[in-house]
Regions:
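Polyanion-binding surface elements
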Residues: 1-23
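Long amphipathic alpha-helical segments
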Residues: 16, 21-23, 32-167
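Residues in the recognition helix of alpha-helical DNA-binding motifs
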Residues: 27
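Residue-level marker of alpha-helix boundaries and capping positions
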Residues: 1, 14-15, 99, 184, ...
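C-terminal regulatory/effector modules of DNA-binding transcriptional regulators
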Residues: 141-144, 150-289
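Extended non-core architectural segments that shape protein topology and connectivity
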Residues: 10, 30-31
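Generic non-transmembrane alpha-helix signal with a bias for helix starts/N-cap capping motifs
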Residues: 7, 20-21, 105, 190, ...
Length: 289
């Protein structure tokens, strides 16, 4: 088995799904619940297996334990997830992410997704407020820049892990090019845009930070994106960023691609180019775009 993947045994899967072990055995034997078997014949389950089961068999488990229960604290977190208590979860994830507790943050993200919360809701109601919270705490001098960076990178890593349990449509509905400007250092938001669009069925072209050597024209010639998503959080060089943005819009327009923008950086950038379809303010708007 892949040692980089988290596996649960039958007892742990039963606790998560809030059923007895005999139900787990029955469901695996009749093919309702997928699993992998070790050389010794033991059943092992991944979050993908449990997520697929919950999505396809909602009536079989009415109150799943969405956060693996190992302590009283775990029970509390599970209850907060079931109640969608985002105010509590923002505090919890903010604190855990600053301490680089990836496993704790990852479990909250997984739990919310297993509870059938849309990805854009998790991003709007939890991830974005946590990032803003820690940014504000740093500006106020209540945490160090290192702690703020710890939080951001922990969240980024956990978002990538979360994407691993999501079922992506095999049939593609278009191609989306996601990027940030050359002076932009914040790529978490555009990564969340990437994940939402992939969930919708788009083939994703993710370049991250634009560089001077990047031939934008070649990307359009080779991959033919029909949408471009650009995120900007902080603009340090307005003239350079404006020039880069205008160039992208010009090329996108020439190839018939629509441009979507988002982030506070666009308060400083003129985005009135005719290629721009809309400025997006939430991840729900990304999903609906």
């Amino acid at each position: 088995m892949d040692q980089t993947i988290q596996y649960f045994n039958s007892e742990e899967a039963a606790r998560i799904l809030n059923v007895n072990v005999s139900s787990i055995k029955r469901w695996t034997e009749d093919g309702t619940l997928e699993c992998v078997k070790t050389v010794g014949g033991h059943r092992k389950f991944t979050m993908q297996h449990l997520a697929k089961f919950l999505e396809e068999h909602k009536t079989k488990t009415t109150r799943a334990n969405l956060f693996p229960i190992e302590s009283e604290e775990d029970l509390e977190i599970n209850t907060r997830i079931l109640k969608a208590d985002f105010a509590f979860l923002i505090d919890y994830v903010s604190d855990q992410s600053r301490q680089c507790h990836r496993d704790r943050v990852h479990r909250v993200f997984n739990g919310l997704y297993l509870a059938q919360h849309p990805l854009h809701e998790i991003y709007d109601q939890l991830v974005t407020p946590v990032l803003q919270r820690n940014g504000d705490l740093w500006e106020q001098g209540q945490i160090t820049i290192v702690e703020e960076h710890f939080s951001t990178q922990t969240i980024r890593d956990c978002l990538i892990r979360l994407q691993g349990i999501i079922q992506i449509p095999s049939e593609k509905i278009g191609t989306a090019f996601c990027l940030i400007m050359s002076q932009e250092l914040h790529d978490v938001a555009i990564k969340m845009v990437d994940h939402i669009l992939e969930l919708k069925g788009y083939q994703i072209l993710f370049s991250g930070q634009m560089t001077p050597s990047m031939k934008i024209e070649k990307i359009f010639e080779l991959y033919h994106p029909d949408r471009v998503y650009i995120s900007s959080t902080i603009v340090t060089d307005v003239n350079l960023t404006q020039a880069e943005f205008d160039k992208i819009c010009y090329i996108a327009q020439a190839h018939g691609a629509r441009v979507f923008v988002g982030g506070q950086g666009f308060n400083q950038i003129d985005f009135s180019h005719p290629a721009v379809e809309k400025r997006l303010g939430t991840f729900e708007e990304v999903y609906l775009s």
